[in-house]
Amino acid sequence: MEVVSKIDQENQAKIWKQIFGFAESLVLKCAVQLEIAETLHNNVKPMSLSELASKLPAQPVNEDRLYRILHFLVHMKLFNKDATTQKYSLAPPAKYLLKGWEKSMVPSILSVTDKDFTAPWNHLGDGLTGNCNAFEKALGKGIRVYMRENPEKDQLFNEGMACDTRLFASALVNECKSIFSDGINTLAGVGRGTGTAVKAISKAFPDIKCTIHDLPEVTSKNSKIPRDVFKSVPSADAIFMKSILHEWNDEECIQILKRCKEAIPKGGKVIIADVVIDMDSTHPYSKSRLAMDLAMMLHTGGKERTEEDWKKLIDAAGFASCKITKLSALQSVIEAYPH
């Protein structure tokens, strides 16, 4: 039998790691559902296995199973285990597993890992031969109909989006002040969700009059102004859209951008908050951005775009120029200027 070389061993290990890649997402979800981070945080001091087991909300707890879950979480570097005392504590990333603060990532974790929202991934390859709608194949209907018929899932999705937007908005208002200080008196936010980003902009720049114009499928619940962006966009010095264009194909995006161009005055601009895929695969967000691209392909038929893709799209919509600013967030800011 052939001896396994060191290189072969390393390559096999990489494949095994990818085979069980799903485990990290689901163990992370389990940690959130069990409130492990909350329990350790509330206790202040590190906790032994038995102490932690006795304080978790779910009771009674099987300590052996909890130990094995914690072992995996420690391996993920989300929690620490002291080699001497055998007690557990929070590692720095675990603060994002705590509920109830503005940078908590719990809603995003629960949304992205939801069993219905992950179901289309099982049909990833189906779309290569024909025009398969993976979401519809997995759940029996397209995503927009599904959301209307399943309000609890729609709420879960919107909470995840709002969570993502809070993280983005913090970076936006702190790192991109110049975007909002060049003659913008009015700003219209157009999108699907809770208006989290526009509210943050309004709070950070109170001199700008901000309005929220939501897509029809969510207006009824959020008491905002309904707007079909394919037909018209509200007039303002700046149009703001976050995570909207990635839901649509290039032709549909060009239509939306043309409506935006018609709505802004000379000296105005369109501010787009969306993923810009990295050509540098070493960027901390590069893998997440590529995964987002696949998620959009599966869920809506949309896509994430590279810097070059964005420039071509904006040029095709008739804009004169654009500027892309990278932030310390999953999304970047793309400013499109009509003149």
Swiss-Prot record:
Enzyme Commission number(s) from the entry: 2.1.1.117
Residues that hold S-adenosyl-L-methionine according to the record: 161, 165, 191, 214, 228-229, 242
Catalytic activity: (S)-scoulerine + S-adenosyl-L-methionine = (S)-tetrahydrocolumbamine + S-adenosyl-L-homocysteine + H(+)
Highest taxon, organism lineage: Eukaryota
Binding-site list for substrate: 164, 243-247
Residue positions of the active site: 246
Any matching Pfam family: Dimerisation
Keywords (A to Z) from UniProt: Alkaloid metabolism, Methyltransferase, S-adenosyl-L-methionine, Transferase
Matches recorded under PROSITE patterns: SAM_OMT_II
GO molecular function, one term: protein dimerization activity
Pathway where this protein functions: Alkaloid biosynthesis
Transferase keyword on record: yes
GO biological process, one term: methylation
Tissue: Highly expressed in capsules. Expressed is stems. Expressed at low levels in roots.
Assembly information from the UniProt record: Homodimer. Forms heterodimer with SOMT2. The heterodimer SOMT2-SOMT3 possesses 3-O-acetyl-4'-O-demethylpapaveroxine 4'-O-methyltransferase activity, where SOMT2 is the catalytic subunit.
Protein task: Methyltransferase involved in the biosynthesis of the benzylisoquinoline alkaloid noscapine. Catalyzes the conversion of (S)-scoulerine to (S)-tetrahydrocolumbamine.
UniProt similarity note: Belongs to the class I-like SAM-binding methyltransferase superfamily. Cation-independent O-methyltransferase family. COMT subfamily.
Name of protein: Scoulerine-9-O-methyltransferase 3
Organism the protein comes from: Papaver somniferum (Opium poppy)
Gene that encodes it: SOMT3
